[in-house]
C-alpha cells in the first residue's frame, strides 16, 4: 500500500528470530498472527508456520528490502538490541544487491545502546534515536552515535526542541501523527518529516497549507 501511494518511506519494526530480523511489532504473537506466546520463543521452523495474513508468516527484513528494491526510504526500528548484527548484514545486502543507497535505510531505536552498537559495526550509517519525552537537554542524546536525525513523539515536540535539533544538524521526524491539528502544528514548527498511517490524508492537508 505504501508503494502504491508513493510514500516517501516505510517504517517497520524488527525482532530477532534465529538468524533473521523478522518484521513484527509486538513482543507476543497473538495480536498479529495465529500464534501464541513470545517472539523470543520462536525458531526458524515455527516462524515459517505462522499466519500473519493470507497464510503467510511475518516477512523477514531481507525479504521486504528485496521487494521494495530502493523505491523508497525504509526506516528500520530495532525492537531488540540482539538484532543489530543481523540488521547490519541485511543493510549491506540491500545496498549491494537491491538497489538501495545507504541514506535510504535509517535505523532507529528507543534503546540507544543498540544504536551505539550499530554505529560501531557500520560507522556513518544513518541512525535516529527514538524519544518519547522532551528532555531537558532536548536533542543531545543523538550525539554519541553521530545520528543524522531524531524521532520524537507528536505530543512532546515543540519549537524549542525543533530549534535545538536543527542547531545540532539533525532532521526532526515525528511519530505518529493522526490528527489534522497536529499535522498543521508540526508543519508550522518546521519539522522535516512525519510518520502517518494514511499518506493520502496527510498529503491532502499539507497541500492546502
Task: Pin down the residues of each PLM region.
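Phosphate-group recognition and catalysis centered on beta-loop-alpha active-site segments
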Residues: 1-209
